[in-house]
């Protein structure tokens, strides 16, 4: 029996990358996983299939988090499949690598809509569904604590806001024994970092050199930390910012 048997988890942005890794890990450990996706239905189905192939249970739900009312849409989809939630992982996010001189208001607003507004209102409308003793994990970024990539400023700002959300929410939900934490990855090998890691001959080497461990992380490394925080073992950790950058900030 897995540590999450009998529990339901929702992972936003779970059709690929870090989100898929988290969904697969929670599913493998017994959770029934709601695999949220924004547009790529085929990729979401692949995540569901991967969870099921490992002996878990999952279902896909769609909601475009860029627009107003997205959180309500997400929960309407969720309610068709489940009647309560134990673990919420706010993972969905979009980035921007344009320097401040080039980023438009539209792009800025889109990044904040998905990365900040969506998690806030997903939680707001999901509080009555989240069972006592539950877990909330918000996927932040090491860039919230370093100016190593200033062209990612708008993205980093959203993660700073998400960290404040985690901190303050832990006080609000603590009375119900619900923990809330931020998990901050560094450079992880996903399709989002493909250009950075594989776009030049030395991309991977330069990225690995940033880590004290001399490597580039995989989604599984982030998923393992999320699984700990979501488990009974993580019951006394809340309001925290967990560095999963492989020592890139040291």
Where do the PLM segments sit?
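Alpha-helical segment proximal to the catalytic Tyr-Lys
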Residues: 128, 171-172
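Conserved glycine-rich cofactor-binding loop
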Residues: 8, 15-16
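A glycine/serine/threonine-rich, flexible loop-to-helix segment
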Residues: 175, 182, 187-211
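Active-site helix of classical SDR
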Residues: 123, 158, 166
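Short C-terminal tail/terminal secondary-structure segment
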Residues: 227, 238-250
């Amino acid at each position: 029996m897995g540590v999450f048997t009998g529990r339901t988890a929702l992972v936003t942005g779970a059709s690929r990358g870090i989100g898929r890794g988290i969904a697969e890990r929670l599913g493998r450990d017994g959770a029934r996983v709601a695999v949220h996706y924004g547009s790529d239905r085929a990729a979401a189905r692949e995540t569901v299939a991967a969870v099921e192939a490992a002996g878990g249970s999952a279902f896909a739900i769609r909601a475009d988090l860029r627009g107003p009312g997205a959180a309500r849409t997400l929960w309407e989809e969720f309610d068709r499949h489940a009647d309560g939630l134990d673990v919420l992982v706010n993972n969905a996010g979009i980035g921007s690598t344009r320097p401040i001189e080039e980023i438009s208001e539209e792009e800025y607003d889109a990044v904040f809509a998905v990365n900040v507004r969506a998690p806030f209102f997903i939680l707001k409308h999901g509080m009555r569904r989240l069972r006592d003793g539950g877990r909330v994990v918000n996927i932040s970024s090491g860039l919230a604590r370093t100016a190593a990539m200033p062209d990612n400023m708008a993205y980093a700002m959203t993660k700073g806001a998400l960290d404040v959300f985690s901190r303050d929410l832990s006080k609000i939900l603590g009375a119900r024994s619900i923990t809330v934490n931020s998990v901050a990855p560094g450079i992880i090998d996903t399709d989002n970092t493909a250009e950075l890691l594989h776009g030049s001959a030395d991309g991977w080497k330069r990225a690995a050199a940033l880590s004290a461990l001399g490597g580039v992380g995989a989604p599984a490394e982030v998923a393992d930390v999320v699984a700990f925080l979501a488990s009974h073992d993580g019951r006394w950790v809340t309001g925290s910012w967990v560095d999963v950058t492989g020592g890139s900030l040291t």
